[in-house]
Amino acid sequence: MGNKRIKAMMILVVMIMMVFSWRICEADSLRRYSSSSRPQRFFKVRRPNPRNHHHQNQGFNGDDYPPESFSGFLPKTLPIPHSAPSRKHNVYGLQRTNSRSSYFWTHAHLS
């Protein structure tokens, strides 16, 4: 009786895999023959330009990444400033209180 159950489970798994693979093929054929507003190839490979193989940029064309490539989908942002603190941040010390330790820390970094 256990042997029949194993066979039934194997048949069920095979049928599920067949249906799943059929759906993938069907979706691929629909994608291939449908019209879309964007190209289907998102990731573009940088191909070396054989005429410029001796240059410093390793011969890659600047037009290998047209605006419709994957990098065109990313939002444009402002450049990120350096993470090091500026002089303006270092001018302000701790506020002076009545204790001696706070007086030391307030004036120690200004020297």
From Swiss-Prot:
Location in or out of the cell: Secreted, Extracellular space
InterPro entries for this protein: IDA-like
Location of the region described as Disordered in the Swiss-Prot/TrEMBL record: 46-65
Biological process, per Gene Ontology: floral organ abscission
Entry keywords, A to Z: Secreted, Signal
The UniProt record lists the keyword NAD: no
Primary residence: secreted
GO CC terms in record: extracellular region
Tissue: Expressed mainly in flowers. Lower levels in buds and seedlings. Detected in vascular tissues and in hydathodes.
Signal peptide per UniProt: 1-27
Biased composition (Basic residues): 46-56
Function: May be involved in floral abscission.
Note: IDL5 is only partially redundant with IDA.
UniProt cross-references to PANTHER family, sorted A to Z: PROTEIN IDA-LIKE 5
Protein name from the UniProt record: Protein IDA-LIKE 5
